[in-house]
């Protein structure tokens, strides 16, 4: 997963719900150095009787926001969805640098 272009990440999930695996794998895929330096990471744990829905929200360097439901996607689907936009930013960056 291309995480270079993430500036903010918000993850909300129930650790015992069906969305937990996708959310935990997503959080593990972010490099520790990036978490410490360039990306603001916020997470919120839900209880079993919480009314809030699980959510993964990513803000990219160009201020584009993507909100995804971890309960409805596998980690592979989630990462390919985010990579699609990251590749667009990477291409744009490569064109501008030439």
Swiss-Prot record:
Alphabetized UniProt keyword annotations: Mitochondrion, Ribonucleoprotein, Ribosomal protein
Similarity comment: Belongs to the mitochondrion-specific ribosomal protein mL53 family.
Record-given protein name: Large ribosomal subunit protein mL53
Any single Gene Ontology cellular-component annotation: mitochondrial large ribosomal subunit
Intracellular or extracellular location(s): Mitochondrion
The species this protein was found in: Eremothecium gossypii (strain ATCC 10895 / CBS 109.51 / FGSC 9923 / NRRL Y-1056) (Yeast)
Gene Ontology MF terms in the entry: structural constituent of ribosome
Function of the molecule: Component of the large subunit of mitochondrial ribosome.
One Pfam family in the UniProt entry: MRP_L53
Main location group: mitochondrion
């Amino acid at each position: 997963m291309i995480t270079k272009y993430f500036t903010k990440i918000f993850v909300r999930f129930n650790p015992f719900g069906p969305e937990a695996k996708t959310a935990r794998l997503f959080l593990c895929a972010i490099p520790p150095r990036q978490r410490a330096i360039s990306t603001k990471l916020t997470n919120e744990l839900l209880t079993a009787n919480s009314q809030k829905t699980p959510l993964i929200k990513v803000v990219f360097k160009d201020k584009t926001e993507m909100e995804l439901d971890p309960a409805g996607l596998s980690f592979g689907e989630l990462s390919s969805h985010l990579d699609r936009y990251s590749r667009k930013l990477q291409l744009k960056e490569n064109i501008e640098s030439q």
